[in-house]
C-alpha cells in the first residue's frame, strides 16, 4: 500500500477516517509481529503505516478545529 495523500484523506468522511485508522493499526500490529518473528520483508512499511495514521489524525484534528 502506498503512502496516503492528504487530498484523499480530506475527501473521506469522519467514519471512513476512523475505519482507515483502525485498519492501519491492525496492519501495524501484524507488521510488528512479523518483525519480531523475523518474517517481515518490507521494513519500511512499518514507518509508512505509522505516518499514515498520523496524517489521518492530523486531518481529523484540523477538520474539528475548523468546525469550532
Curated annotation (Swiss-Prot):
Ribosomal protein keyword on record: yes
A cellular component annotation (GO) from this entry: cytosolic large ribosomal subunit
Domain of life: Bacteria
CDD domains according to UniProt: Ribosomal_L29_HIP
The keyword Zinc is annotated on this UniProt entry: no
UniProtKB keywords: Ribonucleoprotein, Ribosomal protein
Family indicated by similarity: Belongs to the universal ribosomal protein uL29 family.
Name of the protein: Large ribosomal subunit protein uL29
Classification lineage: Bacteria, Pseudomonadati, Pseudomonadota, Alphaproteobacteria, Hyphomicrobiales
